[in-house]
């Protein structure tokens, strides 16, 4: 409606200009009529007519047209005068008079001399009319040019209106599309916000899970540290007890040595006194006895010096132990003070003995003849005491060697535990660093991302990486648990094993029962086969057939019967193995093979068919040519072996992870077989301290000879 109104308003100036042209033509026609033809119009009392003002972009400007009516007194003629104002030298507007009477040209208004002309038919009037025609023709030409300009402007306006309408339609369409797009974008934003909230909740859940796992790891680490600390405290207590016992024994032995020294000095005084007062023969005898006792005194002095050196050695060892444990400082200081006090007492006793010797020299010589027999008895008892002391010293040295071996084992285990702790600390530190880096990366990515699609993709990638890390952490925990389990299997039997081993034993109890039944059947068949082999070769085949027939008839139905039958046949058809090649000696353990090149020790265990033989608490000791020793003890809980079994001890390597091992043990001590190997002694010690010894040759391989039979076996 607005566009139609605009078009009507814009078309009105053209119509007014056409009406004006028609009026001007009619006016020229009326001027050629006689004078008396008059144009009459209805009178209107000063009613101004206003024209529609039109605006154009280039040439048309605002114009105001005023129409005035003037009436003459004689003929009542209404005259209209138009005045137009033009700015900037262009036609700005056109007049549209109210068509009520035929207008006349108001020339007399501008030329006052024309108003005095008498009649219209005068020649001045005709000239005036001619001028008016010229003016009208000029006005017509101007109006035509103005009309052309108006038409061109109107066409341009119509074009612009059409363009405006097209643009308006396009804008409305684009606005609708933008509104639809904005609605879609708002929906997408809502969906993405929901997805983002879900992802953030998932991320928080994952972070909580990681925190819980970290707390579990920390708890496990604290438990392991407590266990290690308890084991270390136990080892320190055992070491302190052993050292205190040794020190007490050393003090007692020193006291006995001091008593013997005092007795020797007393005897020396007797001899010297009798030598002075007696005859020459007795003097010679006493001199010989004196020299002999002097040699013994020197020996005892050497023993004292060696004991002093041992005391110094113990002091040095105590000082070294003082660096490793703070709890031993007070005890070591007390022991050092006791040793110094004893040394002072020894010196005081020596001084007092020397004084007493000077005082009692005369008295002792008088009693010499009476005590010669007693002296001989004392010498004999002294020799016996000497032998007893030597045996005690040997036992003490053996105990010290065992303690050193145990200390080496404990040090190896402590080193392994420290390595495991460092590995766990490193893994926990790396995980913490990775978590912090992932958090930083996630923050940067959340800040740098501009589109929600990219955020979702990155969050999914982060979740996948966290899942992978969780999986890797779980595998790492399983691996560390298996390593701890393998380490606990190698711990000294005096230290109690973890409860996990008992639970694992309960889990595999059913499997062990089936395995024991199968081994029992096989061992019976082997025993029967060995007995038959000693009698006759033909009897062996008959025994095999009978044993296989009995096992097939008495075995269970299904797959278990077929497998046991096959196992029995296989065991009966292998007479050349290491278990069948030697005679069966129940309740014995012997060396079968010692190979220093491939680093393993193979033992042959002969267990009773009823109760079996367990090698728990048995020990292996390797003595190098330079005197250094290393020991390995079999752990508790080893099932008894029935029949002839081969047990292998691998040295210098840890227990393999994820692979079951049967009758195999692992001694993690490294550099056990370093050159030179020749002369290395390998000892097998039973719980009752019975020892079997093997010496390695130059090639480092010892193999039990086939004819030896029982030469290296330890009979229980």
Swiss-Prot record:
Subcellular location: Nucleus lamina; Nucleus envelope; Nucleus inner membrane
Polar residues bias (residue ranges): 532-545, 565-584
UniProt-listed GO biological process terms: centrosome cycle; centrosome localization; chromatin organization
Cellular component annotations (GO), alphabetically ordered: lamin filament; nuclear envelope; nuclear inner membrane; nuclear lamina
Residues of the IF rod domain: 132-515
InterPro entries the UniProt entry points to: IF_rod_dom, Lamin_tail_dom, Lamin_tail_dom_sf, Lamin_tail_domain
Motif (Nuclear localization signal): 519-522
Record's function text: Lamins are intermediate filament proteins that assemble into a filamentous meshwork, and which constitute the major components of the nuclear lamina, a fibrous layer on the nucleoplasmic side of the inner nuclear membrane. Lamins provide a framework for the nuclear envelope, bridging the nuclear envelope and chromatin, thereby playing an important role in nuclear assembly, chromatin organization, nuclear membrane and telomere dynamics.
Subunit structure: Homodimer. Lamin dimers then assemble into dimeric head-to-tail polymers. Ultimately, two head-to-tail polymers assemble laterally into a protofilament with a uniformly shaped rod of 3.5 nm in diameter.
UniProt family annotation: Belongs to the intermediate filament family.
Name listed for the protein in its UniProt record: Lamin-like protein
Gene: lmnB
């Amino acid at each position: 409606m607005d566009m139609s109104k605009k078009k009507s308003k814009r078309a009105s100036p053209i119509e007014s200009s056409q009406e004006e042209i028609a009026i001007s033509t009619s006016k020229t026609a009326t001027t050629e009529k006689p004078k008396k033809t008059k144009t009459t119009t209805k009178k209107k009392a000063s009613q101004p007519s206003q024209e529609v003002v039109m605006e154009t972009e280039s040439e048309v400007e605002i114009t105001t047209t005023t129409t005035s009516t003037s009436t003459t007194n004689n003929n009542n003629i209404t005259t209209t005068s138009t005045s137009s104002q033009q700015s900037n030298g262009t036609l700005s507007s056109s007049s549209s008079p109210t068509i009520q009477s035929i207008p006349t040209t108001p020339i007399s208004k501008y030329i006052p001399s024309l108003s005095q002309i008498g009649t219209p038919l005068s020649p001045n009037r005709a000239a005036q009319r001619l001028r008016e025609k010229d003016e009208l023709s000029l006005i017509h030409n101007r109006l035509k040019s103005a009309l052309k300009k108006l038409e061109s402007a109107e066409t341009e306006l119509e074009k612009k209106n059409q363009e405006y309408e097209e643009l308006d339609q396009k804008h409305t369409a684009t606005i609708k599309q933008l509104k639809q797009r904005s609605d879609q974008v708002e929906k997408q934003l809502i969906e993405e916000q929901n997805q983002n909230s879900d992802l953030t909740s998932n991320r928080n859940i994952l972070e909580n899970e990681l925190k819980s796992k970290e707390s579990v790891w920390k708890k496990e680490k604290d438990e392991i540290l407590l266990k290690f600390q308890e084991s270390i405290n136990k080892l320190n207590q055992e070491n302190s007890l052993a050292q205190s016992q040794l020190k007490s024994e050393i003090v007692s032995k020193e006291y006995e040595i001091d008593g013997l020294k005092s007795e020797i000095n007393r005897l020396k005084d007797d001899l010297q006194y009798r030598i002075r007062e007696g005859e020459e023969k007795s003097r010679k005898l006493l001199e010989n006895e004196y020299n002999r006792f002097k040699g013994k005194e020197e020996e005892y002095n050497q023993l004292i010096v060696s004991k002093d050196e041992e005391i110094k050695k113990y002091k040095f060892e105590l000082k070294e132990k003082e660096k490793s444990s703070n709890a031993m400082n007070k005890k070591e200081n007390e022991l050092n003070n006791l040793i110094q006090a004893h040394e002072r007492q020894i010196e005081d006793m020596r001084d007092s003995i020397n004084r007493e010797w000077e005082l009692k020299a005369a008295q002792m010589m008088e009693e010499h003849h009476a005590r010669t027999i007693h002296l001989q008895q004392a010498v004999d008892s002294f020799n016996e005491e000497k032998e007893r002391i030597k045996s005690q010293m040997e036992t003490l040295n053996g105990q010290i060697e065992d303690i050193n071996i145990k200390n080496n084992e404990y040090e190896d285990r402590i080193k392994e535990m420290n390595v495991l702790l460092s590995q766990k600390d490193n893994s926990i530190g790396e995980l913490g660093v990775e978590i912090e880096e992932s958090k930083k990366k996630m923050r940067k990515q959340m800040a740098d991302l501009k589109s929600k699609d990219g955020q979702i993709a990155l969050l999914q990638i982060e979740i996948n990486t966290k899942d992978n890390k969780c999986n890797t952490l779980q595998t790492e925990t399983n691996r560390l648990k298996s390593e701890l389990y393998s380490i606990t299997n190698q711990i000294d039997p005096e230290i109690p094993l973890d409860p996990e081993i008992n639970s694992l034993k309960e889990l595999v109890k059913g499997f062990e029962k089936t395995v024991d039944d199968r081994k029992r059947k096989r061992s019976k068949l082997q025993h029967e086969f060995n007995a038959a082999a000693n009698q006759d070769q033909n009897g062996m085949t008959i025994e095999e057939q009978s044993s296989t027939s009995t096992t097939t008839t008495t075995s269970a139905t299904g797959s278990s019967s077929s497998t046991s039958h096959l196992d029995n046949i296989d065991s009966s058809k292998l007479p050349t193995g290491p278990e069948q090649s030697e005679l069966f000696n129940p309740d014995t353990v012997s060396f079968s093979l010692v190979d220093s090149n491939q680093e393993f020790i193979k033992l042959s265990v002969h267990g009773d068919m009823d109760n079996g033989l367990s090698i728990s608490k048995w020990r292996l000791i390797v003595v190098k040519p330079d005197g250094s020793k290393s020991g390995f003890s079999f752990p508790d809980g080893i099932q008894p072996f029935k029949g002839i079994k081969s047990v292998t001890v691998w040295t210098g390597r840890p227990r393999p992870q994820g692979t079951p091992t049967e009758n195999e043990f692992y001694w993690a001590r490294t550099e056990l077989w370093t050159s030179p190997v020749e002369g290395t002694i390998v000892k097998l010690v039973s719980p009752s301290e019975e020892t079997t010894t093997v010496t390695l040759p130059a090639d480092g391989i010892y193999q039990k000879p086939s004819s030896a039979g029982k030469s290296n076996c330890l009979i229980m």
